[in-house]
C-alpha cells in the first residue's frame, strides 16, 4: 500500500467511476484499476461494487475515511516542510455552503490568501451545510464553513447575521413592522435545507410551533422563487439574499430577533496544516478583527511567514 494507491481509491470514490478518476488524476484507466485491485488484494476485501457507477462496500466506506485521513496527514507533513521554506507550495481544500459562504465570505478571503501564498493550490467544494460537515468528518476537506453551535468540530467564529421573514408582495403580514414565528404558521412555508435550515427548524421547535411546510428546497434560489410567486412565506439569513432589490418579495425582522452565526471548522486543530492555519487567520482578519475564535478554539494561531 502506498499514498498513490490511496489517492486513486479516494478519487474513484469521489468521482464514482474509474474513467472519471483517471481523467481527474491524469493517468490511464488501467492504472486506476490496477491500483484498486492491488489494495483489494492487500486488504483481502472488496472495496467497491463494480458497475456503471461503482459504489463503496461497507468496509470500503470505512477504509476510505482512514485513507482520506492518511492523505490529509501526508499533505499536512508536506506543508509543514513547505512552511519551513516559506509555504511556497501546497494544497488547501475548502468546503463551502450557500450564498453567504460562497458569494459573501469566501471571495475576499481567497483574494487575500492568494496574494499572500500564491503557491498554494486551492480547491473549493460547495454543497449543503450537512454535506460540508460530512466532508470535514471524512477529511475530504481541510476546512469548511459551518453554522454555530457545532460540537462536532473545532470552530473559529467569523460573523453573524439576522434571520428575516420573507413574504410575497401583498401578503397580509407585510403591513406589520415585525413578524413572529406564530404569524408565519398561518401561511404555507418554504423550508430551505441548506445554510440556515437546521437553525430555522430549531427555532420553531423551541417555540413549540410547527410551520405548514409547503416545499423543501436544497437551493436558496428555489426558496426565494417560491416566495416571489406567492406560493409561500419563509425565513432566510439576510446576508444570503441577492444584493439587487426586487419587488417580488419583502423582508421583515423577526420578533423576537434571531441570528445565524457562521464559523470556519476543522476536524482537529492538532492536525491542521500550515495552509489551513493561514486561511483561518486571514478569514478572521477579514471578518473578525478581534481574532476571537469559536467555542472550542481559543488559542492564537502562529503566523507562517512567506520567504522570498
Region locations from a protein language model:
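Central regulatory/effector-binding core of bacterial HTH transcription factors
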Residues: 91-151, 217
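A short LG(V/I)-centered, amphipathic sequence patch enriched
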Residues: 40-58
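Short helix-boundary/capping micro-motifs
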Residues: 11-26
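Hydrophobic hinge/microswitch elements
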Residues: 128-132, 137, 141, 195-250, ...
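Flexible hinge/capping segments at coil-to-helix
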Residues: 86, 155-163, 167-189
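Secondary-structure junction motif
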Residues: 187-207, 272-280, 287-295
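Beta-alpha-beta core module
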Residues: 152-162, 176, 221-271
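Alpha-helical linker/hinge and terminal dimerization helices associated
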Residues: 42-43, 63-85
Amino acid at each position: 500500500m502506498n499514498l498513490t494507491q490511496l489517492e486513486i481509491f479516494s478519487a474513484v470514490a469521489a468521482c464514482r467511476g474509474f474513467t472519471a478518476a483517471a481523467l481527474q488524476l491524469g493517468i490511464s484507466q488501467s492504472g486506476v484499476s490496477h491500483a484498486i485491485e492491488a489494495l483489494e488484494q492487500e486488504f483481502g476485501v472488496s472495496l467497491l461494487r463494480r458497475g456503471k457507477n461503482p459504489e463503496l462496500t461497507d468496509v470500503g466506506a470505512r477504509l476510505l475515511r482512514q485513507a482520506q485521513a492518511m492523505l490529509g496527514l501526508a499533505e499536512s507533513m508536506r506543508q509543514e516542510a513547505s512552511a519551513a521554506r516559506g509555504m511556497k507550495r501546497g494544497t488547501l481544500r475548502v468546503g463551502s455552503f450557500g450564498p453567504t459562504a460562497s458569494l459573501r465570505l469566501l471571495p475576499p478571503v481567497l483574494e487575500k490568501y492568494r496574494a499572500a501564498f500564491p503557491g498554494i493550490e486551492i480547491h473549493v467544494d460547495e454543497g449543503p451545510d450537512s454535506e460540508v460537515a460530512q466532508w470535514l468528518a471524512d477529511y475530504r476537506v481541510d476546512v469548511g464553513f459551518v453554522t454555530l453551535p457545532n460540537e462536532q468540530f473545532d470552530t473559529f467564529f467569523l460573523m453573524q447575521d439576522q434571520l428575516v421573514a420573507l413574504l410575497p408582495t401583498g401578503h397580509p403580514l407585510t403591513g406589520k413592522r415585525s413578524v413572529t414565528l406564530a404569524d408565519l404558521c398561518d401561511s404555507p412555508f418554504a423550508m430551505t435545507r441548506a445554510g440556515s435550515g437546521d437553525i430555522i427548524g430549531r427555532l420553531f421547535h423551541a417555540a413549540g410551533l410547527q410551520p405548514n411546510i409547503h416545499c423543501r428546497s436544497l437551493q436558496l434560489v428555489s426558496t426565494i422563487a417560491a416566495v416571489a410567486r406567492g406560493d409561500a412565506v419563509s425565513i432566510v439569513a439576510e446576508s444570503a439574499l441577492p444584493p439587487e432589490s426586487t419587488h417580488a418579495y419583502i423582508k421583515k425582522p423577526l420578533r423576537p430577533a434571531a441570528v445565524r452565526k457562521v464559523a470556519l471548522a476543522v476536524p482537529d486543530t492538532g492536525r491542521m496544516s500550515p495552509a489551513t492555519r493561514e486561511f483561518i487567520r486571514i478569514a478572521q482578519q477579514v471578518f473578525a478583527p478581534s481574532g476571537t475564535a469559536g467555542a472550542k478554539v481559543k488559542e492564537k494561531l502562529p503566523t507562517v511567514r512567506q520567504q522570498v
